[in-house]
Amino acid sequence: MINIEIIDFRNFAYGKQKKVDDEIYGGGSGMLLKIEPIDLALENTKGKRILLSPQGKPFTQDDALKLSKEENLTFICGRYEGFDERIRNLIDEEYSIGDYVLTGGELASMVIADSTIRLIPGVIKEESYKNDSFQNNLLDYPQYTRPATYKNMNVPEVLLNGNHKEIKQWREQKAYEKTLKNRPDLIERKNNAK
C-alpha cells in the first residue's frame, strides 16, 4: 500500500567528491545545498514535490488530509544552512512543522509522512481519526480507561453513567476548554471559518 524510496541527491552531484553544497554568494556563514544535484534527482520523481523548511507555511491536519489524496509525494530534505533559493522554483509546496530549526529535513518529512499516511483509506479505521485533535479546529477531549479510580484520581462520573447525550456534551465542552487553554489560536480559526 505504501512504498517509501530514499533518493540521495549526492548520487546526482558532479566530480570525484560528489559535492552537494557550496559557499553562499555574497558571504555568510554555513553552506547551501546546490541546485544541480537536487534538480537532477527530481527529474525522475512523480507527484507533488514538497520542500521541508522552517520558512515554509505551517503544516496542518488539513494539509495532511489533502496530501493523503495524492498518488505520489516527494519530500526534499535540507541540510546545512539551507537551499539555493532557485530550488523553490522546482517544488509544489513548502512546509514547516514548527517555529524551530532542525539539523535536517528528514525528521520533518517523517512527521508529515506519518500524519498523511494514517489518513489514507485502509491504513487505520476512519473512526480512529474522525475525532482526532484538529479535525474540527479543536484539541481532543480528555480520555480515560480502567481502573475508574487510581490513587484518588477518578474518571469523571459522566463517562461512567452510560448517558451518551451527556457524554457527548461533556466531551465537546472539555475539548473546547482544553483548546482554549492550550491553543486559543484554534478557537480563533474556528470562529473565523464560520
From Swiss-Prot:
Q: Which domain of life is it from?
A: Bacteria
The Gene Ontology CC terms held by the record are: cytosol
Which CDD domains does this UniProt record tie to the protein? TrmD-like (cd18080)
| Location relative to the cell | Cytoplasm
What is the protein's major site of localization?
cytoplasm
Mind listing the UniProt keywords for this protein, alphabetically? Cytoplasm, Methyltransferase, S-adenosyl-L-methionine, Transferase, tRNA processing
Any one GO molecular-function label of the UniProt entry: tRNA (guanine(37)-N1)-methyltransferase activity
Task: Please name the Gene3D superfamilies in this protein's record.
Answer: 3.40.1280.10, tRNA(m1g37)methyltransferase, domain 2
* HAMAP family named among the record's database cross-references: TrmD
The family this protein is said to belong to: Belongs to the RNA methyltransferase TrmD family.
Assembly and interaction partners? Homodimer.
Write out the function statement from the record.
Specifically methylates guanosine-37 in various tRNAs.
Q: Which NCBIfam families match?
A: PRK00026.1, trmD
State the name under which the record lists this protein.
tRNA (guanine-N(1)-)-methyltransferase
State the species of origin.
Answer: Mycoplasma mobile (strain ATCC 43663 / 163K / NCTC 11711) (Mesomycoplasma mobile)
